[in-house]
Every structure is written in C-alpha cells, then in structure tokens.
Amino acid sequence: MSKGKVLLVLYEGGKHAEEQEKLLGCIENELGIRNFIEEQGYELVTTIDKDPEPTSTVDRELKDAEIVITTPFFPAYISRNRIAEAPNLKLCVTAGVGSDHVDLEAANERKITVTEVTGSNVVSVAEHVMATILVLIRNYNGGHQ
C-alpha cells in the first residue's frame, strides 16, 4: 500500500523522448523521478490528459492525490474547482518557474503549498539570449537563405 499519490502532468515527447533521455519534461521520461518517488513509498501517476475540466485524467486522479507536478509550458490548470475536489492535495509543484496556472487564493485557503523550481533555467535563458544576439549581429538568417 502506498503512502499517497503523486500526479505528474507532462507533454508527450514521442520519438524525441526515445532519442534523448535528457528530455525530462515529457511523460516518457517523467522528470527522471519515478524510481525516487516509488522508493519513498508513493504511487506515481503520469498523464498528458489535462482537459477538459472536469472529465480529464487529471480530474480523476487529482481526487486522491497529495502532490501534483506540472510544467509551465504544458500546465495543468489547478483551479478552485479542482482544488475543492482534491481533499488530500498538499503540494502543487511547477517543474520550472511560474505559478499562474494555480489558483493561489484557493490554494492558500486550503493551506496547499505552491512551489516552483526558481532559478532552474537561468543558464539556459542566458545562453538563448546570447545565441539570439549572435544570430542578429551576424545576420545568420539572411546568410542562411
């Protein structure tokens, strides 16, 4: 018997997930946390089915989940209605930054902790900006055509 349920809502990586194990944010690679979660005695349920509310897999599984983890680019919207239907929910985690997909007022009323992985993409954002600057300065797109 498990201690509780962790619900993971991620996008489908398809062939890219098979080719690249480091593509962690997809359902195939499950943020790389399945073994850890199960070793702690929890059940991990992973889905891409987050809409429509209230008939999705998220709605069915959230009813008895203690933790929900989602990403900022494929978020499961944790609305007041979903929170009301999830009496065991204690923690909403964004595997990235931002929490605008969680009804913070409803979470606060229920004393549900809402957290994110602040700083997780600082380096990659800086790298992207530098690469974009180089593309623009060197007229890469014009030269490529």
From Swiss-Prot:
InterPro entries membership: D-isomer_2_OHA_DH_cat_dom
Single annotated GO MF: NAD binding
Pfam families reported for this sequence: 2-Hacid_dh
Coiled coil: none
Positions that bind substrate: 97, 121
Record family assignment: Belongs to the D-isomer specific 2-hydroxyacid dehydrogenase family. FDH subfamily.
Official protein name in the record: Putative uncharacterized protein YPL276W
